[in-house]
């Protein structure tokens, strides 16, 4: 979670690289702003229609946007919470230091070792995930609690996954679905090998149908916490250094 301001008023947000646009839950102040338009969006489990409003500014530390179009969420919407999206991060270097619980913005110097990073039209960051037989495409999503693997991908590469119970997941629309879970046995990102950990299997075909670049995985906290991540979003480069296992 990060603390920020909207027109000088304090708001706490979940930092969410999996959403292209910042979301703010309506309160008395936010409700004063007239809707600009509605846009269609999609979570992992369900589609939704979002209301856009324009705020004077949104600021979180060195991240700031003036003015800033955000999605306004109804306070009664299931799972509604403030989300700091890629609209504030996409022009910055962001170092996600999970072993120290810190986010560093615009640190000086170049990445010592970098790999290609792709941002799609909605500014979702994609990284390559190396399995023994191929490289998969994954969205790097700090808003996801558990890593998600597409069921179709899992079915064609079963040797890398071992069944392990089930879990109830919630997507950005608030929809909840119970999903089977697996342990991923071996994968490498940015030259760093990740220890076996739990992932959830979800049919990503509906979400992928709306994307120019389909995703095989959505990397969530269970994966991200094992490393430190150094993103230069403006140069579309990422470096990965070994953190600690959890």
Q: In which residue ranges do the predicted regions lie?
A:
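Pepsin/retropepsin-fold aspartyl endopeptidases
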Residues: 1-246
């Amino acid at each position: 979670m990060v603390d920020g301001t909207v027109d000088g008023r304090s708001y706490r947000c979940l930092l969410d690289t999996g959403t292209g646009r910042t979301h703010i839950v309506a309160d008395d102040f936010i409700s004063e702003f007239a809707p600009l338009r509605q846009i269609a969006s999609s979570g992992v489990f369900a589609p939704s229609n979002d209301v856009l409003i324009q705020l004077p500014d949104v600021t979180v530390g060195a991240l700031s946007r003036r003015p800033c179009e955000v999605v306004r969420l109804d306070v009664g919407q299931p799972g509604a919470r403030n989300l700091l999206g890629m609209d504030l991060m996409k022009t910055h270097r962001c170092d996600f230091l999970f072993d120290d619980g810190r986010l560093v913005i615009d640190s000086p110097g170049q990445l010592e070792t970098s790999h290609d990073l792709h941002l799609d039209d909605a500014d979702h960051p994609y990284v390559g995930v190396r399995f023994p037989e191929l490289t998969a495409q994954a969205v790097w999503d700090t808003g996801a609690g558990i890593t998600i693997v597409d069921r179709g991908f899992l079915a064609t590469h079963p040797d890398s996954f071992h069944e392990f119970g089930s879990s109830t997941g919630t997507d950005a629309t608030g929809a909840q679905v119970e999903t089977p879970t697996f342990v991923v046995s071996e994968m490498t990102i940015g030259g760093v090998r990740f220890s076996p950990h739990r992932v959830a299997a979800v049919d990503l075909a509906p979400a992928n149908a709306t994307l120019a670049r389909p995703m095989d995985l959505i990397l969530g906290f269970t994966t991200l916490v094992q490393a430190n991540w150094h993103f230069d979003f403006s140069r579309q480069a990422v470096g990965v250094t070994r953190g600690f296992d959890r």
